[in-house]
Each structure stands twice: as C-alpha cells, then as structure tokens.
Amino acid sequence: FLEGGSSASQRSEAPVEPTTETVPEQSEQSEPPEQPEPEQEPEQPAAPERSLHQQNMLDLLETLAVKGRAPKTGYSRDEFGQRWKDIDRNGCDQRNDILARDLTNVEAPKGCKVLSGDLQDPYTGQHIHFVRGQKTSQAVQIDHVVALADAWQKGAQQLSPERREQFANDPMNLLAVDGPANMQKGAGDAATWLPANKGFRCTYVSIQVRVKAEYQLWVTQAEKEAIQRELGRC
C-alpha cells in the first residue's frame, strides 16, 4: 500500500458518456426505373375473306379425283355423238343456240340460224362482229370449255355414249369465243392454257370445275394447282 493513496481498484473512473452514432436519414426509396415496353410484333394482315363463290368452287374442286392423264388411245370426235345436237329440243341446233345466247344484236330472221351479231369475246376481251359465211363464220367458234380430248383422257372413256353426247352438247360447257384463241387452246387444260383476258379466268376455271364435277371427270395435280391459283384471285 502507498501512503495517502488508495488502491487502483478504489479509484473511480469518470463515467463514459454513451456515444450515439448518427444514422443518416434514409431518403425516400426511389421508384424503380421504368422498364422499356416489349416491342410488339407488327400485326399480320388478316387473310382476305373468300367469297361464297370462291369457297363453293374450292370445295367442289376438292371432290374431283386427282390422277394422271390417261392415254389418248381410241379418241375421235365421233366418240361424243352427234355434233351440235338439239338436246333441249327447242328446234334449233346447239351451235345456233349458243350464238343466240352469247351474241348481242343478233339477226336470225328465220328463228334459228344466226346470220350476224356482236360478241364481246371472253377469251381476249375484244369485240368481234360475227357474219355468217364461208369465209367469216370461223371468226367466232363454239368452244368446249372442257375440251373433248381432255375429257377423254380424264374419265370420259368410261362414260356411256349417250352421256358423252350430252357432255359434248351441254350449254354449261359451251361458249362462243374468238376463233384463233380457240384454236390456240386446242385440248389444253387449266395447267397449259388460260384466256389472255385475265378478268375472265375465274369464270373460266369455275366452269371447268362444275363441268368436271357434273360428269365425274378428274384433274391432274398440275391442273388442280392452276385452278386453285385462279380461284384465289377471284
């Protein structure tokens, strides 16, 4: 022990002031940055609505068998019976009936035989003045829209002679048209020949579909695709 002193344990220590740390005030939480909106894909244009005619013809086309072209063996015009037979029994042959139906300003003084008239040709879009005569009659010809030879190679061989004759004279399959255009067409189907007049092509292939359905004739794959393309443009 030291005199006049106290032990270290007896010394009182100065109280220690508690320290407080200043906590910085939290600033208001900032809003999260706006996320960029995902880019929207451009809307695809809606497919054009099909007309009732288009849909009906496309549906009818689907009922036709698709096969290859059969050999032309045995074909002749005579296999389709009497030419221009008066099948509706109105007293006029079928050629004159179609001329009277398709021409305007028709002159037929004796009732049946069309002597002249005007044709707005569906195949070329041109106007043709028809005058009957040895050198002029062929300017306007009557076309089988489904050609006889084409029909022969796509099912008509199996038809009865009477049914083939009906086919060859059916007004649904006959059109008054420009002679040279008809000669150019020959026995072509929709895959190999279409009218130069694009405005008539929809009607043209529609007639072919109806006729082939009526007489249970088939189409080739290329022919079917050509018809589908034209119906899609109707």
Where are these regions (language model features)?
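N-terminal low-complexity, Pro/Thr-rich disordered segments
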Residues: 2-64, 234
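Exposed alpha-helical structural elements
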Residues: 53-60, 94-98, 203, 207, ...
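Short helix-coil boundary/hinge micro-motifs
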Residues: 65-70
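Acidic, glycine-anchored loop motifs typical of Ca2+
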Residues: 89-91
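Domain-level detector of nuclease and nuclease-like folds
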Residues: 123, 127-234
